[in-house]
């Protein structure tokens, strides 16, 4: 999942 630095951990991955 493409997430921001804040959502990165919340999404459990993605792109910082």
Swiss-Prot record:
Instruction: Quote the subcellular location field of this record.
Output: Secreted
From which domain of life does this come?
Answer: Eukaryota
Q: Which residues form a coiled coil?
A: none
Q: How is it modified after translation?
A: Conversion of fibrinogen to fibrin is triggered by thrombin, which cleaves fibrinopeptides A and B from alpha and beta chains, and thus exposes the N-terminal polymerization sites responsible for the formation of the soft clot. The soft clot is converted into the hard clot by factor XIIIA which catalyzes the epsilon-(gamma-glutamyl)lysine cross-linking between gamma chains (stronger) and between alpha chains (weaker) of different monomers.
What GO biological process terms does the UniProt entry carry, in alphabetical order? Answer: adaptive immune response; blood coagulation; innate immune response
Q: Which UniProt keywords apply?
A: Adaptive immunity, Blood coagulation, Coiled coil, Disulfide bond, Hemostasis, Immunity, Innate immunity, Secreted
One CC-aspect GO term: extracellular region
The yes or no answer to whether the keyword Transmembrane is present is: no
Describe the subunit structure: Heterohexamer; disulfide linked. Contains 2 sets of 3 non-identical chains (alpha, beta and gamma). The 2 heterotrimers are in head to head conformation with the N-termini in a small central domain.
Domains as described in the record: A long coiled coil structure formed by 3 polypeptide chains connects the central nodule to the C-terminal domains (distal nodules). The long C-terminal ends of the alpha chains fold back, contributing a fourth strand to the coiled coil structure.
| Function, in words | Cleaved by the protease thrombin to yield monomers which, together with fibrinogen beta (FGB) and fibrinogen gamma (FGG), polymerize to form an insoluble fibrin matrix. Fibrin has a major function in hemostasis as one of the primary components of blood clots. In addition, functions during the early stages of wound repair to stabilize the lesion and guide cell migration during re-epithelialization. Was originally thought to be essential for platelet aggregation, based on in vitro studies using anticoagulated blood.
Name this polypeptide is given: Fibrinogen alpha chain
The organism's taxonomic lineage, starting at the top: Eukaryota, Metazoa, Chordata, Craniata, Vertebrata
